[in-house]
UniProtKB/Swiss-Prot annotation:
Record gene name: lig
Keyword field contains Protein biosynthesis: no
Lineage: Bacteria, Bacillati, Actinomycetota, Actinomycetes, Mycobacteriales
Protein name: Probable DNA ligase
Disulfide-bond pairs as recorded: none
GO molecular function term, any single one: DNA ligase (ATP) activity
PANTHER family: DNA LIGASE 1/3 FAMILY MEMBER, DNA LIGASE-RELATED
Family note: Belongs to the ATP-dependent DNA ligase family.
Active site positions: 212 (n6-amp-lysine intermediate)
Top class in the EC scheme: ligase
Length: 503
């Protein structure tokens, strides 16, 4: 298949808000692929290379020919082979050899192909929250039910591998995907609750009520003496958190997978600001800042997979091996006990509580009602769509944020409001320095961004409004913090915003 067909499909998918049309366009290209083309094409249409990040930046791409080709000629095989070759180059003179291979490739690309390829190679290709749409398209193209495709993806964390299995082996190949210790699974997610009473009542009181910490999500895998730690986006951070590795290696088990949070504490035991915890995950780790783990789930223990077991059984497994590192929680409290636990969580400096169904399995990668988060104020994780230049004291700074909610059908985020409230001088400076790196377009007043950055917004409520495309507007929105641990695909949906409407 010609690479130009992939570029055209990407353009068509990005041009529509209709989930049905997106799935149809992706299916149409998938059914035309040769077996060897499935893995790279699914990766590209998901905004990544099947080889992973290969260390290519704008400096390496500085020698590409100035004039694009007139006629499409590059095939999927050509491109994938070149990327594989570039990824394998190392040693003396490697930079020059990489540039030569890429220059030869770009000399054969058209203008549209070149734009797509530049963004793909530099990690700058924004495909939106396409994972769910691509999963549906794979199922449609392979003529399979959607659910086994979704489950295989959640367990593998890799859409290209899931697609290959679907086309090569059907349902049998997909059901062969299992939880593999050492390979992260996509985390189960919670939905916001209107109140503690609503969550407790909806789940029938057969619940675990746990502290909701202001920490960073972690997934820890242990196999013998081998321990790996991953973030909520499945990025490995093992080398940055030796204290967590040492702690889990010392637990009384031979193999385990734990889900939880980690955070830094003050000398008095209260949580430090979220940004301080996240600083440990960077390349320049602040090693003097000790992280503490708080686990709330056990997905595997000593050879037994527990994903499909009810939460009550998973909590019992966690209690057997890590009782001192469990997140504070109550099993089947009455309504008064749940309320007291909520108050205790807030008094300890935490965000609120999670209310979880004790009967629910672990729905990897899914956001449902089996887990509900309760906070004292409404908060939403929204996508930053742009920022306006400030005036007065904020002249010269990017200030007023344009905020969008995720489209559950995989379209572009839907704008629901603006705010500059809550922005400190430090955040204003950071935005002004950082936002141009994500710039999509600009005019005299506003810098428009690719949907990369997620910000946590506190608000008093939501009202119906014709001012924004979603028909909703945030009331008294203010910035709490940025969420570098979250992608746009994990932002709250327009449905979650709509659920906050009164009545």
């Amino acid at each position: 298949m010609l690479f130009s067909q992939i570029v055209a499909t990407s353009r068509d998918v990005g041009a529509t808000r209709s989930r049905k049309v997106k799935v149809g366009a992706l299916r149409e290209v998938l059914i035309q692929l040769e077996p060897a083309e499935v893995e790279p094409v699914v990766a590209w249409l998901s905004g990544e290379l099947r080889q992973g990040r290969i260390g290519i930046g704008w400096r390496t791409l500085g020698d590409i020919p100035a004039t694009p080709a007139d006629v499409p000629a590059v095939t999927v095989s050509d491109l994938d082979g070149t990327v594989t070759a570039v990824a394998g180059i190392s040693g003396s003179g490697s930079a020059a050899r990489r540039r030569k291979l890429l220059a030869d490739l770009f000399a054969r690309t058209t203008a549209d192909e070149r734009d797509f390829l530049l963004r793909l190679l530099t990690g700058d290709l924004r495909q939106g929250a396409l994972e769910g749409v691509m999963t549906d398209a794979i199922a449609a193209a392979a003529d399979l039910p959607v659910e086994p495709v979704r489950r295989a993806f959640m367990l593998s964390g890799r859409l290209p591998a899931t697609a290959v299995a679907a086309f090569d082996g059907g349902v049998d190949a997909l059901t062969a995907f299992r939880l593999e210790v050492g390979r992260p699974v996509r985390p189960m997610l919670a939905s916001p609750a209107e109140s503690l009473t609503d969550a407790w009542t909806e789940l029938g009181g057969d619940v675990s009520v746990e502290y909701k910490l202001d920490g960073a999500r972690i997934q820890v895998h242990r196999n013998g003496d081998d321990v790996h730690v991953f973030t909520r986006t499945l990025r490995e951070i093992t080398g940055s958190v030796p204290e967590l590795v040492e702690l889990v290696a010392g637990l009384p088990c031979t193999s385990a997978v734990f889900d939880g949070e980690t955070l830094a504490l003050t000398d008095s035991g209260r949580p430090r600001p979220f940004q301080e915890t996240m600083s440990r995950f960077g390349a320049e780790s602040a090693r003097d800042l000790l992280l503490h783990p708080y686990f709330f789930d056990c997905l595997h223990l000593d050879g037994v997979d527990l994903l499909d077991a009810p939460l009550e059984e998973r909590l019992a497994a966690l209690e057997r091996v890590a009782p001192q590192h469990r997140i504070p929680g109550l099993i089947r409290p009455d309504s008064d006990g749940a309320a007291t636990h909520f108050d205790d969580a807030l008094a300890a400096g935490h965000e609120g509580v999670m209310v979880k169904s004790l009967a629910a399995p672990y729905a990897a990668g899914r956001r449902g009602r089996a887990w509900q988060k309760v906070k004292p104020e409404h908060t939403l994780d929204l996508v930053v769509l742009g920022a306006e230049w400030g005036y007065g004291r904020r002249t010269g700074y990017l200030s007023n944020l344009h905020l969008g909610a995720r489209d559950p059908d995989g379209g572009e985020p839907i704008m629901v409001g603006k705010t500059f409230k809550g922005l400190t001088d430090a955040l204003l400076q950071w935005q002004t320095d950082e936002f141009p790196r994500h710039e999509r377009d600009r005019d005299d007043h506003t810098v428009y961004l690719h949907p990369d950055l997620v910000v946590e917004i506190e608000l008093d409520g939501v009202q119906v409004s014709t001012r924004y495309p979603g028909g909703l507007a945030l009331r008294f929105a203010r910035v709490l913090r940025y969420r570098p641990d979250k992608t746009a695909a994990e932002a709250d949906t327009i449905d979650a915003v709509r659920a906050l409407l009164p009545g």
